[in-house]
Amino acid sequence: MHCYLLSVFLTLDLAAVALSLSTCSTLDMDQFMRKRIEAIRGQILSKLKLTSPPDEYPEPEEVPPEVISIYNSTRDLLQEKANHRAATCERERSDEEYYAKEVYKIDMQPFYPENAIPPSYYSLYFRIVRFDVSAMEKNASNLVKAEFRVFRLQNSKARVSEQRIELYQVLKSKELSSPGQRYIDSKVVKTRAEGEWLSFDVTEAVHEWLHHRDRNLGFKISLHCPCCTFVPSNNYIIPNKSEEPEARFAGIDDYTYSSGDVKALKSNRKKYSGKTPHLLLMLLPSYRLESQQPSRRKKRALDAAYCFRNVQDNCCLRPLYIDFKRDLGWKWIHEPKGYHANFCAGACPYLWSSDTQHSRVLSLYNTINPEASASPCCVSQDLEPLTILYYIGKTPKIEQLSNMIVKSCKCS
């Protein structure tokens, strides 16, 4: 009886070794590509909060230059970030996530002196918020993350219940009334609801300011479509009807709430003193960086530099170019016409040895439960965003879609 049980165990053991060499599914490139294309279709619609592609209208003969400018600057920023990472060999993200960070709070610079009335260039359609981060310049290379936080006040008199506000990085421009800008993020807010904090990731903008002081021109808060009226609940646009921001922000719209009364202005400032717009900077202390031991040799990156020049059946990055018109049947995305989405595929074999008991247990589990395989899968590791310029009706819109471009893979 004991010999029989031993024989069964060895048979299962050897079978498990063979099974453990497989990935989550059979390597069928055509199938992987079809699934990736359909996943991208769903991703784009989901990230834009659309249930179906917008109705198609004839594209305008010429896109407004200011729209093209925003698209180009946002696209170029993403490319600069990618180039910077490749050129400087940045610290591994695992180090940044592991070590404790020091947090610094930097309040917004006041618009005007304590007893003064705002200047005449105060705009009804946008707000400019500035910060002095010069004190942090000596620690610029240690910046891990920066968040812009602003408190939305309840506006019970708001004419609309919802508005989509957008945050831009202000760029150099000849005209103060019409600054250049780079899109960062957007949020839909309920204007009449109880006040709340809104947070935006502004790491890249602050990183740029710390290295180039002259580029620190602040942030711009504006509506999604100041030249029209945008209805977030159904993505409907009313053209040629300018919309004013109904969302109010502590420390920014104090003058609006005080109706020009200096006494009321002081009262509002005191009331919301703890809710001033501010930056939260998270830095990795220098002494923690200096105390790190020299890192061990890193694993070979399963990225384009390696995978595209080596024929691999194992887990690797696979090239895939998506043409929006050809592959998705879409004409509503104006720029780009397509992009290199890529995908991960290939086997993830276990490293088998007599002392790897963990692998032995996983393999036996894989044999007993084939439908719930514990084998590692080939998945994406590094992803980059994609900027698109598209139309809803005749209105151009620019969006940055996160995690759309696969840059490297791993077994997990």
Swiss-Prot record:
Disulfide bond annotation, renumbered to this chain: C307-C316, C315-C378, C344-C409, C348-C411
* Database matches in Pfam families: TGF_beta, TGFb_propeptide
Any one Gene Ontology MF annotation carried by this entry is: type III transforming growth factor beta receptor binding
Keyword set includes Glycoprotein: yes
- SMART domains, sorted: TGFB
From the record, give the transmembrane residue ranges.
Answer: none
GO biological process: what's one of them? Answer: signaling
Q: Which CDD domains match?
A: TGF_beta_TGFB2
**Signal peptide residues on this chain, from the entry's feature table:** 1-20
Sorted alphabetically, which keywords does the UniProt record give? Cleavage on pair of basic residues, Disulfide bond, Extracellular matrix, Glycoprotein, Growth factor, Mitogen, Secreted, Signal
Any one annotated GO CC term: neuronal cell body
Superkingdom to which the source organism belongs: Eukaryota
Q: Which residues are glycosylated?
A: N72, N139, N240
For this protein, the record's InterPro entries field holds:
Cystine-knot_cytokine, TGF-b_C, TGF-b_propeptide, TGF-beta, TGF-beta-rel, TGFb2, TGFb_CS
| Family to which this protein belongs | Belongs to the TGF-beta family.
**What protein name is recorded for this chain?**
Transforming growth factor beta-2 proprotein
- The organism named in the record is Gallus gallus (Chicken)
